[in-house]
Each structure stands twice: as C-alpha cells, then as structure tokens.
C-alpha cells in the first residue's frame, strides 16, 4: 500500500527551524543531505517525517519555485511500490511533472495545484539519531 512518508516545509533558516522542532515537539533528526540546489533535513515524530528544505541563495529552479517564494508548505511525498507505473498514471491523468527528466524523487502538480512527490519504497529510513521523540501525555 502506498503511504505518505513526509511533509516538506520550505524554510529560510535550516538550523533555527530544526532547533524549534527538536525543542518544542521532540522530533529526532533522521538525516541531512545536499541535493542539487538545496539542503534537505528530515526530522521525525516516529511515524511521519517533516522534511525541512533550504534552497541555495539565488536558486530559480522549477522545483524551488513550485510552491511559491518564501517559506511555505512545499510538497508532500508518497512512497510507491513501482515508480514507473505511478509516474505513468500521473502523466495519464494530465498532471504537470515539475522534476527534470530522470530525477528521483519525481515532483508533480496534482489536480488543484498541490505539489506532490513520489518516492520509491524504502527511500526514507527511520532515525539513526540518539534522541527519541517525546511521548505524548494527557497533562493539562
């Protein structure tokens, strides 16, 4: 079954935003990597990731501008069993492919304008970090 694996936030300050999600919500860092024109840092609550995306200064790529300028919810990603079949179905339904040809993951604009991404199953792993997400309590 396909599943949502992360929600991506486009941010201006990667370190400050990371500190916020760690301190306020107890999210653990999964990984940080430099990808083409941006740095992507995945944090998790143990179930779903929040991907913080910081684009390089002056970047004007289609992906960087897809959700608009400045900080915003950039996209959500769905893990799929078969990338070729999923991409073919997306194209068949008339969705605009935003990513350059051959780039994985594949970003696209869904009906209604939302930017989405498909990723191969297992691309995003769970945390290697020592810290664990805080358990929710019912304290008032």
Tell where the protein language model's regions lie, with residue ranges:
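A short, acidic/glycine-rich surface segment
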Residues: 37-38, 58-64, 125-127
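Core segments of cupin and vicinal oxygen chelate
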Residues: 8-50, 104-107
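Conserved beta-strand in the GNAT
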Residues: 51-53, 117
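N-terminal beta-strand motif that seeds the catalytic metal site of vicinal oxygen chelate
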Residues: 1-18, 73-78, 122-140
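Short Gly/Pro-enriched turn/cap motifs at secondary-structure boundaries
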Residues: 33, 66-68, 97
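Vicinal oxygen chelate
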Residues: 3-12, 41-44, 63-140, ...
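Residue-level signature for short turns and capping positions that connect secondary-structure elements
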Residues: 48, 57, 121-123
């Amino acid at each position: 079954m396909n599943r949502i694996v992360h929600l991506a936030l486009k941010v201006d300050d990667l370190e400050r935003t990371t500190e916020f999600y760690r301190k306020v919500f107890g999210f653990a860092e999964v990984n940080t990597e430099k990808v083409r024109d941006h740095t992507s840092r995945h944090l998790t609550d143990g179930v779903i990731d929040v991907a913080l995306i910081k684009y390089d200064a002056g970047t004007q790529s289609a992906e960087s501008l897809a959700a608009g300028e400045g900080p915003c919810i950039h996209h959500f990603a769905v893990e799929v069993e078969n990338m070729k079949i999923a991409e073919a179905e997306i194209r068949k339904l008339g969705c605009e492919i935003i990513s350059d040809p051959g780039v994985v993951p594949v970003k696209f604009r869904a009906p209604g304008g939302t930017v989405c991404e498909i990723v191969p199953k297992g691309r995003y792993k769970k945390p290697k970090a020592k810290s664990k997400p805080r358990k929710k309590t019912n304290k008032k």
